[in-house]
Amino acid sequence: NLYQFKNMIQCTVPNRSWWHFANYGCYCGRGGSGTPVDDLDRCCQIHDNCYGEAEKISGCWPYIKTYTYESCQGTLTSCGANNKCAASVCDCDRVAANCFARATYNDKNYNIDFNARCQ
């Protein structure tokens, strides 16, 4: 769920607040469209698509589904024992949080003009 995703981000990117990723580029935060502005934005596009796939599992609501995962020390390696939906959502979040840690954060891509740059 989004709260657990926030915690994963804080684990993998401890030097930046999670909310810096909530309105970044064309895909981090609300919806998404157009071409990702950089690698970090591509992480969010992949995460959005991953949640879309998880939603195809009967009764799976990624934004609110809770799951178990191993506590972190800079990288997240395991999602623990979960049912199919929870495992899918956890893996979406784990992959994205680790992707965020590898990608460069460009301040110019925070809070961009969505209508002008993301069509």
Curated annotation (Swiss-Prot):
Ca(2+) binds at Y27, G29, G31, D48. It is found in: Secreted. Pfam families: Phospholip_A2_1. The active site is at H47, D93. Binds 1 Ca(2+) ion. Expressed by the venom gland. Disulfide bonds join C11-C72, C26-C118, C28-C44, C43-C99, C50-C92, C60-C85, C79-C90. InterPro entries: PLipase_A2, PLipase_A2_Asp_AS, PLipase_A2_dom, PLipase_A2_dom_sf, PLipase_A2_His_AS. GO terms for cellular component: extracellular region. Keywords: Calcium, Disulfide bond, Hydrolase, Lipid degradation, Lipid metabolism, Metal-binding, Secreted. The keyword Calcium applies. It catalyses: a 1,2-diacyl-sn-glycero-3-phosphocholine + H2O = a 1-acyl-sn-glycero-3-phosphocholine + a fatty acid + H(+). Its cofactor is Ca(2+). Its EC number is 3.1.1.4. One of its GO terms (molecular function) is calcium ion binding. The keyword Transferase does not apply. GO terms for biological process: arachidonate secretion; lipid catabolic process; phospholipid metabolic process. PROSITE patterns: PA2_ASP, PA2_HIS. Belongs to the phospholipase A2 family. Group I subfamily. D49 sub-subfamily. PLA2 catalyzes the calcium-dependent hydrolysis of the 2-acyl groups in 3-sn-phosphoglycerides. This is Acidic phospholipase A2 DE-II. The lineage of its organism: Eukaryota, Metazoa, Chordata, Craniata, Vertebrata.
